[in-house]
A protein has these predicted regions:
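Active-site/substrate-binding loop(s) of hydrolase catalytic cores
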Residues: 67-69, 80-204
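Active-site-adjacent mobile loop/cap segments within catalytic or ligand-binding domains
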Residues: 208-264
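Glycine-/small-residue-rich active-site loops that bind phosphorylated ligands and cofactors
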Residues: 78-79, 236
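Short beta-strand-to-loop junctions in surface cap/lid or active-site-entrance loops
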Residues: 55-66
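Short glycine- and acidic-rich boundary segments immediately preceding or forming the N-terminal edge
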Residues: 1-54, 158
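Conserved beta-strand scaffold positions in the cores of enzyme catalytic domains, especially
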Residues: 39, 55, 108, 158-160, ...
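Short glycine-rich or small-residue beta-strand-to-loop segments that form or flank ligand, phosphate
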Residues: 70-77, 232
Length: 264
């Protein structure tokens, strides 16, 4: 079946509609009639609708186990356009394919750093001066929104998309806190890498290329794992989207299967 939402997102992006409103418009329209897709707006300190950060929530079909909860974040740096694009298309695919989304709940912020995005800057001057990292008392609005989100639900996995202009292929760095996650997600990434040429990944790296941004989460009973996916500038937006989807879907399936089997 043709995924018209995904097609609209791709066509609008190729036509130059890379701003947040243009990017998410097809998803927001689809959410009006969807049984699984919800669009929300996370409030900031101004409480103004125009300053709220948009997010999407996919609630997959009921399964005989607690849902696997995953948070996906893109656009942490305001001049990124490919990580938001990849997330938008990922959500469109999850909404369309009930088999992929069954037993999972996914919350996605395509453009977390809305302020920097609107100024087309990596970070704003204020964010550079005061810091823009979680759990370091940052006053940045997007940081506070994500911190609240990480305490709102007991997430199993946080996926952070970043653009790496120096990378020649998509790579991933993975921080696995729980022993069960080390087994389940480690095996899933190993299997994915065996079938995917040029995909590199590291578990709990001592000298990471990307600093993890969201974990460890303070004052929670169980830590989520964090996967940082670096998008290679050598790939086209379409190729990057395919890479992201392949990695995320492999991890979702592994977590869901493990929970269903009582191994998670």
């Amino acid at each position: 079946m043709l995924n018209t939402t995904d097609l609209l997102i791709a066509n609008r992006f190729e036509a130059g509609h890379t701003d947040i409103d243009g990017l998410i418009a097809p998803l927001a329209e689809r959410a009006q009639d969807s049984a699984s897709l919800i669009v929300g707006y996370a409030p900031t300190s101004t409480r103004l609708r125009e300053d709220a950060i948009p997010y999407f929530h996919i609630c997959g079909a009921y399964a005989e186990h607690p849902p696997v909860r995953v948070l996906i974040v893109g656009g942490w740096f305001g001049n990124e356009v490919r990580s938001p694009y990849a997330i938008a298309r990922l959500i469109a695919t999850l909404e369309m394919d009930e088999a992929l989304s069954a037993g999972v709940e996914v919350t996605a912020f395509p453009v977390a750093n809305l302020v920097a995005n609107r100024s087309n800057s990596y970070l704003t001057e204020e964010q550079i001066a005061t810091g823009a990292r979680c759990w370091e008392d940052s006053p940045a609005e997007h940081v506070k929104v994500i911190e609240r989100e990480l305490h709102r639900y007991p997430y199993d996995l946080v996926v952070f998309l970043r653009e790496n202009p120096r990378a020649l292929e998509t790579d991933a760095e993975v921080w696995l806190a729980e022993e069960s996650h080390k087994r389940v997600l480690g095996a899933a990434l190993k299997a994915y890498a065996a079938e995917t040429p040029n995909f590199r990944w590291k578990t709990n790296p001592t000298t990471p290329v990307y600093r993890r941004s969201f974990t460890p989460v303070p004052k929670v009973a169980r830590q989520p794992s964090e996967v940082v996916i670096g998008l290679s500038a050598a790939g086209s937006p379409s190729e990057q989207t395919t890479d992201v989807a392949g990695i995320v879907f492999a991890l979702l399936k592994a977590l869901r299967d493990a929970r269903q089997a009582g191994a998670l």
